[in-house]
A protein has these predicted regions:
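S-adenosyl-L-methionine
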Residues: 1-34
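Secondary-structure boundary elements
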Residues: 3-7, 67-68, 126
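Mobile active-site "lid"/loop adjacent to the S-adenosyl-L-methionine
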Residues: 13, 30-61
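Short, glycine/acidic-enriched loop or turn micro-motifs at the edges of active sites
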Residues: 17-18, 39-40, 79
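Short, well-ordered secondary-structure micro-motifs
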Residues: 22-24, 44-46, 85-86
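A generic structural signal for well-ordered alpha-helical surface patches
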Residues: 56, 60-63, 89, 120
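Short glycine-dipeptide loop
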Residues: 61, 66-73
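C-terminal catalytic and target-recognition region of SAM-dependent MTase-like enzymes
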Residues: 70-126
Length: 126
């Protein structure tokens, strides 16, 4: 990480929902949040994560963690049932309407240039 200049970055590899709830309780703030949640998952103790059921709560917690100025959020969604417009609406409900935002489709392009979708993204900066 040092050679890339990212030695000051803290990578979190634990249950993301538990982490953000704990950080909210501690009153911590962040300049950047990158959310890359799975569509579905199970925790070590049998906890179940379903993106459609938990993403709004995750965004509400992240809204409390993200600094009000000079900050950004990136959200990737890998559920074909969630469009970039739905992501935008959920982010607006949690954070308000930002001055700068982008959204679109995540896709692979095959050898014949056919675009194969696998999710959506939404990002904003303040």
């Amino acid at each position: 990480m040092e050679s890339s200049g990212l030695d000051g970055v803290r990578w979190i590899v634990e249950d993301a929902m538990k982490f953000v709830e704990r950080e909210v309780r501690r009153g911590n703030k962040y300049n950047a949040i990158i959310l890359d949640p799975p569509a579905y998952g199970r925790g070590a103790n049998g906890e179940k994560w379903v993106l459609e059921e938990h993403i709004c709560r995750m965004l509400e917690c992240c809204a409390e963690l993200l600094e009000r100025k000079n900050a950004f959020l990136v959200l990737n969604l890998y559920s074909m049932g969630l469009s970039s417009m739905l992501a935008r609406t959920a982010v607006h409900q949690a954070f308000g309407v930002p001055k700068f935002e982008q959204m679109g489709e995540l896709y692979f392009e095959d050898r014949s240039k056919k675009q194969i979708p696998f999710g959506t993204y939404y990002r904003f900066k303040r």
